Structures are given as structure tokens and as C-alpha cells.
Amino acid sequence: MTDRLTKEQRHRNMSAVRSKNTKPELLVRKYLFSRRFRYRLNHPRLPGHPDIVLKKYRTVIFVNGCFWHGHDGCKYSVLPKTNTEFWENKIQRNKERDIREQKELADMGWHCITIWECQLKPVIREQTLESLAYTLNHIYLNDRSVKLYEIQEDNQLLAAESDCDYMKENLK
């Protein structure tokens, strides 16, 4: 099957596909800002240049397109019928890169959240975004909760000792 578009038309279409400021990313950013979460965009020093970085929460958010990042089981993640081998390899490499970068971030102590494009469709958008806010608050509280220390039980009595030599002498 041949492509319906000329090479120049296809090039123009593909060059219009953005990697930053996509509609799903803007939806998440607008929601976070309205809930007073403050963030940075595409931090250059972190692996994978996460879409959204919340330093206060030690959390990064990736807003992934279902097609480009190979969302398993999603109806929007369908391979094109032409040049399928190329697209399979490309999407597989993207998935491997995503896993590698998230592991690197986790090793650095960052929490990683992935939001898929299909989770921001109007039917479930509010539920997804509220779940995101809940998760961020949960992370914040867990990281900053009071850490209980363990009391080591030893057999030495230090205060109010019951077996003191001077007490034994006075009792005689």
C-alpha cells in the first residue's frame, strides 16, 4: 500500500508533531497549577528530560502519547499498516528507553509518574487528574512524615535500677 501523501506533505505533517507543549501535557500542567502545585519543565539535568518536575515532591511526571510510547492494550496504540517493521522497532526502542530512564530516576531518589494520553480523554480526565493530585499529596506526606526511631532493648538497667549493690546493703 502506497502513501497517499507526497514526500513533502508527509514531512510537513510529521514535523508538526510536537514533543513539548502537547495538548495532554498542557492539560496536566493547567490542572497542577490550578491546584497550586509548582513545577519546572523538561529539566535538562535529569535523565529523559521529564515533562514536568516537582522538586518539592521529588517527583517527575511523563505525559506519554499512546502511539509514540507503545501503551499496551490501548486502542490509540495501533501500528500503521505500512512500514510496520520500522514502527515496531521504533516504538520498542522508545519503550526500552522509557524503562531505562525511569529506573535511573528511581535510583536517584525520584518518584516517577506516567500519565497516558488516553487517560486524559474527557470521559476520565477529571478522575485521572484528581488521582494525580492524591498521589502527589501521598508522596509528600510519606516523605516528610515523622520517622519513628527504634528503642533497642538491652538488659542493662540505667535509671531506677532494682539490683544495685548499695540498695542490697541498706536492706540488710
Positions of PLM-derived features:
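Nucleic-acid endo/exonuclease domains
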Residues: 1-114, 118-172
